[in-house]
Every structure is written in structure tokens, then in C-alpha cells.
Amino acid sequence: MDFNSLRKEIINNNASVKELVNDFFDKIKHKDPEINSYICTTKDNAIEQAENIDKLIQNKEKLPPLAGIPIAIKDNICTKGVATTCASKMLKSFVPPYESTASSKLWSSGGICLGKTNLDEFAMGSSTETSLFGVTSNPWDINRVPGGSSGGSAASVAAGFCAAAIGSDTGGSIRQPASFCGVVGLKPTYGRVSRWGLVAFASSLDQIGPITNTVSDAAEILYSISGKDPFDSTCLDKPVPNYLNDLNKSINGLKIGIIKECFEHPGLNQEVKESVLSGVDRFKALGAEIIEVECPRFNDGIATYYVIAPSEASANLARYDGVKYGYRSKEGSNLVDMTSKSRAKGFGDEVQRRILIGTYALSAGYSDAYYKKAQKVRTLIRKDFDNAFKKVDVLLTPTCPTTAFLKGDYVNDPLSMYLSDLLTVPVNLAGLPAISIPCGFDTKGLPIGLQLIGNVLEEGKILNAANIFEIDAQVIKNRPLF
């Protein structure tokens, strides 16, 4: 249910906010065991929040912009007094003493927290199969993955277990699951949204963003959570426009660049390619000018990312030693031995794999060959985007090379898993905003996503184009039945 539908229910007195929130919890209780999108729910707090909104309505007071909207939070984003586990044994018992800036802004705007959603451990993955709390299923086909690492957030929105969810995107972790689950996923410009309270994976790449049913809902969430934050030095001190204002503006004459290298990649599924190209035709019919552009180093993004991201993860995760917090092994003959055993048992296989890759890439004698070289390629990728944006307003690619794959297909094949982020990681390396919207289905009935990429701080352009496409295409007429 999108925001406007919920508001109509409330305004027309068809239901109180408390009743609507209880309906969501009933659905979660009876249906989520099949999906496993939530790690925990926060019913008592949600009911209290709902009652406060109901009082405002009864007293005919001015309502905050997200009043009564039920929202789920990815479990790598800190929530005061509510466990934030990162789906890891290492943080299974960690309860933050503070609220993240992004979630705090949501609650100040009237949003209601339903709970914390499942993810790949420490947000390292593309399938939500590495969680301590079990695998999440795709609502369109429960034998398939929802994508990752924000798979729980995307699945909860697609199944109707919340009206919106917040995720994090380091290399595609909002957009890829949004594509797999047939919902909207927005990764903002790096620094547009504060990372204060987001458990760090790769600090130069991580960004918080919304997963929603509609583009307009994503625009509302982005407006609420954006803006300067004194607790995050990388957060941009730039004006935040109301993204709703230009959502319905005509895209006649909008220059959309089709990245040649993406559509020529041998790993791109033919059905995905055809569906996205049909989307290109729709944009053309809506008045956009279609221009083919080249980004010669676009396909180098995946190799570059898997040097930089693990390197930063290696440094960030060094803090988890079982001394001050986190899992502590009861074994160990001394401090070093205890720390080693705590990390070996506290982290899962994929997290350990990435720590090892990153440590190697940063090690003496190898950092020049790997990490520093990857940073140089990152600069070249950014320059390719800069050159493309001299010719066009927005760039367009498929979100993912394939539709949702079966559980177990890639979990023991890291290379294939990493390649599922082929079309999303260059955006993070360049710090650009991008949105995934549904554009069709394959012959198995699985959703296909189309990605629009904007220049720095030009979320308004991609939201406008995505909204016009969404209204015209009406791709998602019915959600999975849950």
C-alpha cells in the first residue's frame, strides 16, 4: 500500500493509525515466517507512536509529513534501545544507546517503526543468504532470493509488510533487491543522507536510502532524511529541494544516455535486455531524446569495487575484537588468542573472506598494485561519468544482469555472486544518485528493474523521469499475494 492510499484510509476515517499499524503486525505475524523479512518487530513502540498520531488527528492539529506511515529499518542502522545485529553473531546482543540520524528524522516526520529487517551479514552480499537469522525469500517466488544486502527491506515492501523500508547501498544493496522484488529503490548522492548510525562496511561507498512501492513515496522519504548532519563530516551542507514539486514535470526533451558497454556485456540476460530496451522505447515515446554514450571503464567497476570495498571493510571491522562489545569467545589463552577466536567464530564465511581480501590488498608490498591502483581506476570511472553528463541529463542501464536467482545457486560461488552487482557498483564508486524502477517481467513472472543514474545531487531529475515512466507503464498492477 502506497503512502497516498494509507492517507486516504486515515483521512476518510476508515481506520485509525493504530488499527492500520495493527493490521500490518497481524500480516507480519501470520505471513512473514514464509518470507523471513524481519529480524525483530517493535510493536509496543509502534502502537505508542500510532496513538500519538491519532491524538493529533482527533485534536485537528497539523500532522507531520509522514504521519502514520509504517516503515521498516535495515538491521545495520542503529535504533536506540532496539538490537542492531547486522545479522551477525558478532553483534547479536548489541543494543545501540543512540538513534541513527536517518531514522531519527523519519520518526520526527511522523513515521512509525515496525521493526528491523534481515540482510546479508554486515551488508556483505547480494542474496540475503548469509544472515545469522536465516535466508529471506522473494515474495514473487519463495524459492528465489530477494537480492541483497537489503533483501529483507525489499521483500517486506513487496509483500506488504510495511509501506516503506530503509536500506543501505554500498555497491547496489538497495537497487539490486528492489529490482529482484519489483519495487522502487533509491541510492542518493554520496553525502546527501547522513551515515551517522549506519554500521560501517565501506565508508567511502556506503549510503542510506529508501525502498518503496512508488517513486513519489521514495521522493518523500528522501526529502525527510536528507540534509547536513554535524555528526557526519561527509554529509553535504547543501539545500534539500522538495522532490515532490517536479515529479510530474514533462520529460519532453530530456536527454537520456544509454550506456553502450552495459547492453553489450555478455553476462546480460536476453530477457532483461529486451525488457529494458522496451523501457527505452517508452521513454522515447514520452518525449525523451535517446543518445548512446560510452563509459569505457564502466565494466572495470566490479574489479575496482572488490578491491576498495574489502579494503575499507578490513579497516572498519578491525574494531570488533570481543573486548568492549561484540561476540567474545570463552576460549583463548591470552588476549591475542581470545581476539582471534572471537573474530573467527563471530564473523561468517563471507565477511571473513572480504576481510582477508582487504587485508591482503592493503598489506605492505601489495597496496600499490591493488588498492592504490583501484583508486586510480575509480577516478577514471568518475571521469567517464563526467564526460557522459556533458552530453545527457540522465543515464540508463538495466539494474541487474539477471532476474532473481534460486536460493543456493551462487552462495558457494563468490565470483558469480559478485557479478550480480556488475551494473550498480560503478555508481557507488562515482558517488552518484541512482534509482531502480520496475520495467517488466521475464517469462517466469519475475520482475525486471531499470536503473536511472543522475549527476551529483540531481536526484530530482531521476525521480522525475522515473515517476513519469511509472505512471505511464503501470508495470506493477498487482503485488504478490501475502
From Swiss-Prot:
Q: What is its EC number?
A: 6.3.5.7
Gene Ontology biological process terms in this record = translation
Q: What is the lineage of its organism?
A: Bacteria, Bacillati, Cyanobacteriota, Cyanophyceae, Synechococcales
Name of the featured protein: Glutamyl-tRNA(Gln) amidotransferase subunit A
Q: Which family does it belong to?
A: Belongs to the amidase family. GatA subfamily.
Question: What GO MF annotations does this protein's record show?
Answer: ATP binding; glutaminyl-tRNA synthase (glutamine-hydrolyzing) activity
- Active site (catalytic residues): 74 (charge relay system), 149 (charge relay system), 173 (acyl-ester intermediate)
The role this protein plays is: Allows the formation of correctly charged Gln-tRNA(Gln) through the transamidation of misacylated Glu-tRNA(Gln) in organisms which lack glutaminyl-tRNA synthetase. The reaction takes place in the presence of glutamine and ATP through an activated gamma-phospho-Glu-tRNA(Gln).
Q: Which InterPro entries match?
A: Amidase (IPR000120), Amidase_CS (IPR020556), Amidase_dom (IPR023631), AS_sf (IPR036928), GatA (IPR004412)
Q: What GO cellular component term, any one, is given?
A: glutamyl-tRNA(Gln) amidotransferase complex
| Top EC class, one word | ligase
| Subunit note | Heterotrimer of A, B and C subunits.
